[in-house]
A protein has these predicted regions:
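Active-site microenvironments in enzyme catalytic cores
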Residues: 1-104
C-alpha cells in the first residue's frame, strides 16, 4: 500500500470499472497485452452485468489482465495498467437475475 499512500489514495476497497469500449472481449477471442508491458498476469473477477438503465441484471466471470510492471512504476498509472484493448475476457455465459438471485 505504500505507493498508493504516497499519492494520497487510502487503503479502502475500491470498485473498479473498465472504461474503454474495446477492453472487454468474449469467449474465444484473443486477449490483448499492451506492447509497453513485459509482465502481465490474469486476475479472475466476478463481473456484474448492467443494462442501459443502470440496473444489475446478471453476473458472469471475467479474466482481467493487469500490467504489473506498468502499475509498479507509479500508483498513478493504475488506470493505464488495467484499461487496455481486449484486456478483459468475459463469459462464456451470463447468469441472469430475472427471478431474484441466491447463491444456490
Amino acid at each position: 500500500w505504500s505507493q498508493y499512500l504516497e499519492v494520497g489514495i487510502g487503503p479502502d476497497a475500491e470498485i473498479f470499472t473498465k472504461s474503454p469500449v474495446l477492453s472487454a472481449v468474449g469467449p474465444g477471442a484473443k486477449v490483448g497485452v499492451h506492447p509497453m508491458s513485459t509482465w502481465s498476469n490474469p486476475e479472475p473477477e466476478a463481473v456484474m452485468v448492467v443494462n442501459a438503465r443502470g440496473r444489475i441484471v446478471g453476473a458472469t466471470l471475467g479474466n482481467d489482465v493487469n500490467l504489473r510492471d506498468v502499475e509498479g512504476r507509479s500508483a498513478l498509472l493504475l488506470g493505464r495498467a488495467k484499461d487496455n484493448n481486449a484486456s478483459c475476457a468475459l463469459g462464456p455465459l451470463i447468469r441472469l437475475f430475472d427471478g431474484g438471485f441466491t447463491l444456490e
